[in-house]
């Protein structure tokens, strides 16, 4: 049997792989070495002709300045690495609440920097080869939707000077099936690092929706679970540390395709997920039903909001196994942080306090139209109350404010007589019109006697 695939042909000359020395694969096309040489000859002839006729060569464009990531902490000494308290203070300025999650991330990122500094010192001979090896500790963030898991990761990206990429686990499938290979996660990191492999190998990857790849049942199935357990198995070596082959164009790997090799040993992985139903598994294990954690009605039962966090803090690795994660994957994510659901007070703070708070964003937008926007405290509380009722966390806030501001944002740019717009509680609850204050010059003048 021939070692070549006779069905593969050059898209330009039509020769099969057996008839040429090299067949280069691209996204849906192939080109042989003979066609590449022909292209080079054509380009050389055109260059010779242009020089012979005295044509001016094209003016070289200056190379774009490299974009700087983070705060310039790349390859710092241990004394210059941002301390966990400094990292948390930065997170506090942009994310409200979630103290435990911030502390876990701050310590993990600080240790990641120290580990990179140690490895660089060891590589340069400044550290003893007999010293203790420092291993990375990947992180798992567990919390309901809209509580700030992804925002925490994205805020870290603004602070750090290592490449940072966010990936969605729901798009991944086992190799050989329709969907994305797990290596495409590394491709995103490589693209952020401007295709510099050394930089990418120092980066951090946040894998969102990790709970969506849980296997369908606790016991292994005889059928293929290509988007669940199969993906978990494919992630094992990547999380632990391996040399992965990444296709530079993305998509599925091809046997004749040139790939970029990336060592994942020094890449920090942060995984996040809602893990809906995990609290019920924990409750069944610790036997707290008689203490009022769960209200049971027939075959279905509902966990009280204020007790969910207490249950989740008692979670053990075996609970994650029952949820659908394989033990090998859990062992490679040793650090677990529970991100709390948001209450009304926290939602109010999210609306007004962060540097990029939603209220501040709309105030900035209307200021560009020379209008001062104000939110009454009762209006902010009413918005937070409605967002809490929708049970989608902070994501509901933007939807509610967008609904409130639609008519205002539509009318005000065309009006020059308005100086101030006030959002009231009645506007939030009854969808009434906003209170507008007109410029004194636009008010009707009193009639003279």
Swiss-Prot record:
Keywords, ordered alphabetically: ATP-binding, Chaperone, Metal-binding, Nucleotide-binding, Zinc
MF terms in GO: ATP binding; ATP hydrolysis activity; ATP-dependent protein folding chaperone; protein dimerization activity; unfolded protein binding; zinc ion binding
SUPFAM superfamilies reported in the protein's UniProt record: Glucocorticoid receptor-like (DNA-binding domain), P-loop containing nucleoside triphosphate hydrolases
Residue sites binding ATP per the record: 144-151
Ranges for region Disordered: 51-76
Gene Ontology CC annotations of this record: HslUV protease complex
Superkingdom of origin organism: Bacteria
Record: residues binding Zn(2+): 10, 13, 32, 35
BP terms from Gene Ontology: cell division; proteolysis involved in protein catabolic process
InterPro entries: AAA+_ATPase, ATP-dep_Clp_protease_ClpX, ATPase_AAA_core, Clp_ATPase_C, Clp_protease_ATP-bd_su_ClpX, ClpX_bact, P-loop_NTPase, Znf_CppX_C4
ClpX-type ZB domain span: 1-51
Pfam families from the UniProt entry: AAA_2 (PF07724), ClpB_D2-small (PF10431), zf-C4_ClpX (PF06689)
Family: Belongs to the ClpX chaperone family.
Subunit structure: Component of the ClpX-ClpP complex. Forms a hexameric ring that, in the presence of ATP, binds to fourteen ClpP subunits assembled into a disk-like structure with a central cavity, resembling the structure of eukaryotic proteasomes.
Role this protein plays: ATP-dependent specificity component of the Clp protease. It directs the protease to specific substrates. Can perform chaperone functions in the absence of ClpP.
This protein's name: ATP-dependent Clp protease ATP-binding subunit ClpX
Protein's organism: Trichodesmium erythraeum (strain IMS101)
